[in-house]
Structures are given as structure tokens and as C-alpha cells.
């Protein structure tokens, strides 16, 4: 190991002769793996790809992973429907959970390679969302999110929340 160069000590300064410990290499992937990998059939997989592209097509890979994490966190929550299609198309008394299912964007998108890779990483167990179950656009002004949920992070054009 190469030791960093040390400056010459001044006459009255005492410099210990201890070796400098080597720093461990930082982790390359700062993501948390969830307990199990997800196995989706082709229809569920396509719905997940399309909603991620519709919601986060202009985001970077992490932004796309965050949206996919929210969907999969909901699937596994026991609070929301237990399928991707059920989560994505769920309607509540407040309306649709995901705007692209209402305005038709989910059916018009072309899924990018980056979106496919981001979704595959999430399906492989990566969770960069800190368990988020909700997100909203930074452009929307919904006080319900901030009053009712715990904000966990902001990335790109979205803010993410947990219960």
C-alpha cells in the first residue's frame, strides 16, 4: 500500500511514528437489497416497465428505480393490492393513484433501455427508496402528502414519502 506523503514536522512538534491505517474501499452500490427477488409474469412486467417510463421517462436511472421501488414496495406492503397491475390501476376515493393510467400515457410510451435496466435492478432486489410508498411531482402542490406522510427524499422531479 502506498502511504500518503507527510509534511516535515517543525522542530518543537512531535510526530508519532505509527503507520497510517489503510482505508477500506467504499461500497460501490449504496442500495439496500430487499428480502426476496421479484418474479413477475410478462404482463405484470410490461405494466411495470410502462408505468415507470410514463412517470419517470425523463429521469436518470435512480429516478426510474425510485418509481419502480414505490410500485414494488406497495405490492409487498399488505396495504395496497398485491400485484403490479392492481397497484398501478388502483382507484381510491381520491381517484387514480397514477395519472398516466387516466391520461393514457401508460399506453403511448416507448420503453427505453435505461428504464428496462432500472426496472430489472429493482426486480433483482435493489431498493434506493428508503421504503417509499408514495411520490409526487415537485411541480404539484398537494399539501395532503406533506401533512399526512413522512417525506423521505427528493430526487429529480419527484418527492418520495412513507406512511
Please name every model-derived segment.
Residues 16, 21-163:
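Bacterial extracytoplasmic/cell-wall-associated proteins, especially those involved in peptidoglycan
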Residues 1-22:
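Intrinsically disordered, low-complexity, repeat-rich polar/charged segments
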Amino acid at each position: 500500500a502506498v502511504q500518503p506523503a507527510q509534511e516535515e514536522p517543525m522542530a518543537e512538534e512531535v510526530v508519532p511514528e505509527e503507520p497510517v491505517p489503510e482505508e477500506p474501499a467504499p461500497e460501490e452500490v449504496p442500495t439496500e437489497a430487499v428480502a426476496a427477488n421479484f418474479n413477475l409474469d410478462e404482463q405484470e412486467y410490461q405494466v411495470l416497465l410502462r408505468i415507470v417510463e410514463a412517470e419517470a421517462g425523463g429521469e436518470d436511472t435512480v429516478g426510474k428505480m425510485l418509481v419502480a421501488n414505490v410500485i414494488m414496495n406497495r405490492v409487498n406492503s399488505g396495504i395496497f393490492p398485491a400485484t403490479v397491475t392492481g397497484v398501478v390501476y388502483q382507484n381510491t376515493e381520491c381517484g387514480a393513484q397514477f395519472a398516466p393510467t387516466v391520461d393514457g400515457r401508460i399506453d403511448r410510451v416507448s420503453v427505453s433501455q435505461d428504464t428496462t435496466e432500472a426496472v430489472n435492478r429493482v426486480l433483482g432486489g435493489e431498493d434506493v427508496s428508503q421504503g417509499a410508498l408514495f411520490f409526487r411531482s415537485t411541480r404539484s402542490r398537494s399539501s395532503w402528502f406533506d401533512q399526512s406522510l413522512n417525506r423521505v427524499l427528493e430526487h429529480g422531479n419527484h418527492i418520495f414519502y412513507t406512511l
